[in-house]
Each structure stands twice: as C-alpha cells, then as structure tokens.
C-alpha cells in the first residue's frame, strides 16, 4: 500500500535543486539598474550601459534580454560570465515620433531560469518642443456652442517664437491671446464657422528657434452635428 507523502516533503527536494540557480543570481552585481537620459531634439537614438560582475564561484550564462518595447533593443558584450569577470549590456532606444517621458525595461534572463534575474530601467525624456493642451477639441449636439481654448507652450531652450498657424479659414475661426496666468505662451480660441456640418480638421501650430530649429504641433478639431 502506497503512502501519500506530505507536500512539504515533495517541495524540499525541488527547492534544493533550485538553490544553485538562486545563489548564482544573487551573486551577480550590477553597477546600475536605472539610467535617465534627456535627448536632444535632433537626436534619434539614445544608449545606456549596464555592467554586471559575477561575484559567485560558478560560471553563468545570460540566455536572453527581453525588452518592453519595439523601440528598445539590447547589445550584449558577451553571454558567458566566469567568476570574477564582467560583461556589459547596452540598451538602445530609437525615438521615432515619440515625445515626452518614455520608460523602457530590459529583463535579463539566465540559462534555465524562468524569471528575470534583473530588470534594467531606461528612462528617456524627449523634449516636447511645442506642447498643446488639449490636443483634441470637439462639438456635438450635447455640448455648448462656445469656443474651445487650447494652451500652447514652447520649450524656450529650442523654440523661441511662433512662426505660423495653418488651418482652413472657411471652416474655423481662430483667435490668439496671452495667457493671463503666464503658464502658457499663447491661448488659441477655436470656433467652427457652422455647427450644422461635420468637420474633421487639423490645425498645425509651427514654431522656430536658433540654428534653424523648427517644430510643430497638430491639433484635431471635430464637429458632429
């Protein structure tokens, strides 16, 4: 007759098998696990380096590095780390059309481990050269037939003045005024010419700065009769 073994009895051998892997992971020492970068407007790629040293007595192998975004990649100096040796992981970030704060993660996995041994953070700030709040305004039968206000702010480090506001004058009325609070550089007041026709219009706010720097922000205007 077979006897049922206690669950604790079964889990102890399994835990014992995992101990070497856990020990190896705990003996890896990182110079840093978080890097903050502020990109320049014309910069397309940012990079961050993370160095890991094997402080244990066993050789370990990095199996893979998983990134949290298609915009983020990784370059591994070497996969096998002998005791006392180190390797470097370089995180790469491609800006594309992104703006603002981008928090990307790189998860590092060792051989025969389902869980990441470390999560590396690459926090990238991309300057918003012309910021518009809100970027979308709309009217429908349930909303008031009054103007909508959009606050425009320039990043004065790069964009020093407005150059143009492009829109269809047959569809929209746009006026400009200073922000009485001083928080924004300009307030746009937008009103459709008519509320009885459907409008899907884009307003482009353009600015310029030193060394030929140019930027624009797009506003989306909707009227649903």
Model-found features: residue ranges?
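Structured core of small recognition/catalytic domains
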Residues: 161-225
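Positively charged n-region of N-terminal signal peptides that target proteins for export
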Residues: 1-4
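Short strand-edge motifs at loop-to-beta-strand transitions and within beta-strands
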Residues: 85-91, 148, 184-188
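Surface-exposed binding patches on compact interaction domains or structured appendages
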Residues: 57-85, 157-184
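Bacterial N-terminal signal peptides
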Residues: 9-20
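Long, low-complexity ectodomains and other extracytoplasmic segments of secretory-pathway proteins
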Residues: 18-58, 113-157, 209-225
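Short, solvent-exposed loop/turn segments enriched in Ser/Thr/Gly
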Residues: 33, 42-49, 96-105, 143-150, ...
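Beta-strand-rich extracellular modules
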Residues: 94, 109-113, 206-210
